[in-house]
Curated annotation (Swiss-Prot):
GO MF annotation list: RNA binding; tRNA pseudouridine(55) synthase activity
UniProt keyword list: Isomerase, tRNA processing
Name of protein: tRNA pseudouridine synthase B
Organism from which the protein derives: Syntrophobacter fumaroxidans (strain DSM 10017 / MPOB)
Keyword tRNA processing (UniProt): yes
Superkingdom, natural source: Bacteria
Gene that encodes it: truB
Length: 306
């Protein structure tokens, strides 16, 4: 009988100069994983929290990508680049505008809340079937998409012209590079991101993150398994129901949800609720259940091997 494969969530600290996909590939090979995938790309020059779903957990990765993110970054005032970060080509400089700390604080506050943000020219978003960065490299101009994002908070950490350190908690889809560029334009001097570090993704912060070196050390003796967040805990932001009835659980393992149990519990949730965790008495994730699917064609149950 094949040994049960480990499933759960790894919280990694992505190093500078590596793509998110490359880090996942290395960890997957290092740990001998069958499946692995990350939840939210970090630019190669950026560092910090990268969530990686392992084996069965890849089946709920979409439930993690929408969580709020926290970033700390250093912006360089007075210089704009085509990529909006230090990896790009300088397109504009302005050293005759030196904002005061008060002006900077006022501008930062104006960026809090819900806003429509333009997607940067150098981004992986597709337009006309092509990624924006591919079109930008070819010199092809297109109308850039715009997205509604929410800046929960935007804090000034330190300021010594021309460098300013900022921290933000923001919604899914927020481009920090664009946030810095917009701030620079509001100040009248322009700006680009020099350093970017993701401090947290949802409830998972750097204090729980492991480096690639730590994963390498833990691969030889299996100690990396202690870093694996159980699937039910990885989805702690979702509501949960515990199944203690052995017969109901037995049917669930075969992809069938007891009709009486479903009728009894569906009324506990509003029609706006998404998936609900169904967990065993000992806290393991048995399934995701949609009590109120958005359409009659949507699957209502996603079962996981115990």
């Amino acid at each position: 009988m094949r040994e049960k494969e480990p499933s759960g969530l790894l919280v990694l600290d992505k190093p500078e100069g590596m793509t998110s996909s490359t880090l996942v590939t290395r960890v997957k090979r290092l740990l001998g994983l069958r499946k692995a995938g990350h939840c939210g790309t970090l630019d190669p020059f950026a560092t910090g929290v990268l969530l990686v779903c392992v084996n069965q957990a890849t089946r709920f990765a979409e439930q993690l990508t929408g969580q709020t993110k926290v970033y700390r970054f250093t912006a360089r005032l007075g210089i704009e680049t085509d990529t909006l970060d230090r990896t790009g080509t300088v397109v504009r400089t302005r050293d005759d505008v030196v904002p005061s700390e008060r002006e900077l604080l006022e501008a930062v506050r104006l960026h809090e809340g819900t806003q429509v943000q333009e997607v940067p020219r150098y981004a992986a978003v597709k337009v006309q079937g092509k990624r924006l960065y591919e079109l930008a490299r070819k010199g092809i101009d297109v109308e850039l998409p715009r997205r509604e994002v929410h800046i929960h908070r935007f804090d000034l950490i330190s300021y010594r012209y021309p460098e300013v350190v900022l921290e933000t908690k923001c919604s899914k889809g927020t481009y920090v590079r664009q946030l810095a560029a917009d701030l620079g334009r509001r100040l009248g001097c322009g700006a680009h991101v020099m350093h970017l570090r993701r401090l947290a993704c949802g409830p998972f912060g750097l204090e729980r993150a492991s480096s690639l070196e730590q994963m390498h050390d833990g691969a030889s003796d299996g100690s990396w398994l202690a870093k694996l967040v159980p699937m039910a805990d990885a989805l702690s932001h979702l509501p949960a129901l515990t199944i203690e009835d052995g017969q109901v659980l037995s049917r669930l393992r075969y992809g069938q949800l007891d009709a009486d149990w479903e009728a009894e519990h569906s009324g506990r949730f509003s029609r706006r609720v998404g998936p609900v965790r169904i967990v065993t008495a000992d806290g393991r994730l048995a399934a995701l259940w949609w009590p109120w699917p958005e359409s009659e064609h949507q699957r209502r149950l996603r079962v996981f091997q115990l």
